[in-house]
């Protein structure tokens, strides 16, 4: 996750005297952030769902006791942040029991929901948990969102969920996955954020996992991505200068950090040196390092986009043992300070900022986890290379390919 607001507020800390919350809860934490898909069942079948969720039971999911025992082990390991996800987490009958347990242990707890099941009947229970943050997905205006989510009326139900959270005093965020189908609706989504007094805007670039991989042909061309990021940076900077507390973050494309640096050179050049130092300290992609995933069956993955690569299972080995085991070739590479990147990513002058970006896009398109990330939208001039072979094209999904960590 790339916290745009955090970096821009740090450049103008005196403006408005309203800095956004810093990136703690990570401060001083030993274990990774755990995004936990507690249930795979969902009342929607979204086109870009990495979990390929559906409205049916998935056998073998962890029991209440098994989840709590794993939470205990995670806390001992040093993890302090849990993002409870699905499927739709509100479809798990014990979601509030598990959430209360996590809060009582001292975890920062976020809830990742599609928002359609947040109602007058359960908003009190949601408030009683004391979630630190509730993220609700909105992928466009009404018709576009309902098409993405494959359910008529999903947009109105999600907006209701946002309003109920806001009325209950719960910090709520809007999550938006950017594709060719909804790119022109980004201005309207940013306006929606203001109208509904949403606290946080999360823009996710399309990553190639689950249905997102099967629909990867809808990913943006690079110039489209650049236009979207220009708008997001400009909107965030306007909020910073006005002293507004809204947060803007992105995910699944760590080239955003480098592009912000180039945006700053054009728009706020006096801050470029300080910004570059902060971005290098950030270091980019955290898969296998500070971000992890446990799926509904207890399988551990380097992050949520690696469901076809399992490191181990919490019912068979402690999470801490799985996470620290670098005998696995993928984890060995991800944990290295200088990842074994190849091609364009290896030659990039900014790899110390982006960390090699998303490895899953390279994995799904080429079968090689260390190949160039086709989602990088920076030009050859910007990354400091010349006379490279043609970029890896984003081809339509045509079935599984042979993969290897080399």
Map each language-model feature to its residues.
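C-terminal accessory region of radical SAM enzymes
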Residues: 223-274, 299-355
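A structural motif corresponding to the C-terminal lobe/cap of the Radical SAM core domain
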Residues: 195, 214-246, 280-283, 368-382, ...
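Short Fe-S-cluster ligation motifs
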Residues: 73-86, 371-406
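Short, acidic, Ser/Thr-enriched surface-loop or helix-capping motifs
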Residues: 294-295
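Short, small/polar residue-rich loop motifs at catalytic or cofactor-binding pockets
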Residues: 285-288
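N-terminal pre-core extensions flanking Radical SAM catalytic domains
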Residues: 1-56, 72-75, 319, 393, ...
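Radical SAM/AdoMet-radical enzyme domain recognition
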Residues: 64-221, 225
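Local cysteine-cluster metal-coordination motifs and their immediate loop/turn environment
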Residues: 43-51, 343-360
């Amino acid at each position: 996750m790339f916290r745009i607001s955090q970096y821009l507020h740090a450049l103008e800390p005196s403006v408005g005297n309203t800095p956004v919350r810093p990136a703690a809860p990570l401060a001083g934490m030993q274990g990774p952030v755990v995004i936990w898909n507690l249930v795979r069942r969902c009342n929607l079948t979204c086109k870009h769902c990495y979990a390929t969720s559906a409205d049916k039971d998935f056998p073998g999911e962890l029991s209440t006791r098994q989840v709590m025992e794993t939470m205990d082990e995670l806390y001992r390991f040093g993890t302090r942040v849990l993002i409870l996800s699905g499927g739709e987490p509100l479809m798990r009958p014990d979601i509030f029991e598990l959430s209360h347990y996590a809060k009582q242990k001292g975890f920062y707890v976020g809830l990742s929901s599609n928002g359609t099941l947040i109602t007058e009947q359960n908003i009190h229970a949601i408030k009683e948990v004391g979630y630190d943050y509730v993220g609700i997905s909105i992928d466009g205006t009404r018709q576009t969102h309902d098409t993405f989510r494959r359910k008529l009326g999903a947009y109105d139900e999600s907006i209701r969920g946002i309003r109920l959270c806001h009325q209950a005093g719960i910090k709520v965020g809007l999550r938006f996955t950017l594709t060719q189908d909804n790119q022109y609706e980004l201005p309207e989504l940013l306006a929606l954020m203001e109208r509904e007094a949403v606290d946080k805007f999360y823009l996710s670039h399309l990553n190639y996992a689950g249905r997102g991989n099967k629909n990867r042909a809808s990913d943006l061309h690079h110039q489209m991505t650049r236009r979207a990021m220009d708008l997001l940076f400009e909107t965030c900077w306007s909020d910073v200068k006005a002293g507004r507390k809204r947060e803007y973050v992105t995910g699944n494309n760590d080239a955003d950090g480098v592009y912000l640096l180039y945006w700053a050179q054009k728009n706020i050049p006096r801050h470029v040196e300080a910004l570059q130092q902060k971005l290098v300290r950030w270091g980019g992609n955290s898969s296998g390092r500070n971000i992890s995933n446990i799926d509904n069956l207890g399988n551990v993955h380097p992050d949520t986009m690696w469901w076809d690569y399992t490191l181990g299972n919490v019912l068979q080995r402690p999470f801490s043992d799985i996470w620290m085991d670098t005998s696995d070739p993928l984890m060995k590479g991800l944990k290295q300070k200088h990842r074994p990147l190849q091609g364009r990513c290896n030659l990039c002058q900014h790899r110390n900022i982006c960390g090699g970006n998303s490895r899953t896009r390279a994995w799904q398109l080429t079968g090689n986890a260390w190949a160039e990330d086709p989602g990088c939208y920076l030009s050859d001039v910007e990354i400091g290379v010349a006379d490279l072979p043609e970029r890896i094209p984003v081809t339509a999904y045509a079935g599984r390919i042979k993969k290897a960590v080399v």
